[in-house]
């Protein structure tokens, strides 16, 4: 498992340009970046969400669109830190069903910890920054470079917000592919 996670980490590092030949100056440790990370919702999750009447909508400059029978969203990369192996994003997504809503914003991909965090607020209250997903090796490369599985916190917030018992820790939520050199 450790070997697999190291392979995933290296694939993500290379894809976002954090591993490069040569050396940089001290001020190059944190950089402003262009590009985006594409997140594709797992088809089974998309079916569950839409079947429950939950509507997703992009926030603050994110883009959402149909993709291979499911939904994809692009979140702008705003910078990265070599020291903390963190990729920062702006934008977010809201999930709404009737009066119930949850907003997830300003994602950080933390490669060192293998987690994706975001700022959460909505019907459950203003929670602040929490770990939302665990980064795992993708089992569906056509949807994304890495698989995102729910943390217990994220699953609990989704279940509490929508009054369901459909989300569980370690369940696949979707797939992600950072595209740091692509136009948003």
Task: Identify the function of each model-found stretch.
Residues 1-27:
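Secretory targeting and sorting signals
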Residues 19, 23-24, 120-122, 166:
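Generic alpha-helical propensity signal that fires on short helical segments
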Residues 27-82, 145-184:
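N-terminal segment immediately downstream of the Sec signal-peptide cleavage site
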Residues 59-128:
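Predominantly extracellular/secreted and cell-surface proteins with exposed
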Residues 119-120, 125-156:
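Extended amphipathic ligand-handling, pore-lining, and cofactor/metal-binding catalytic surfaces
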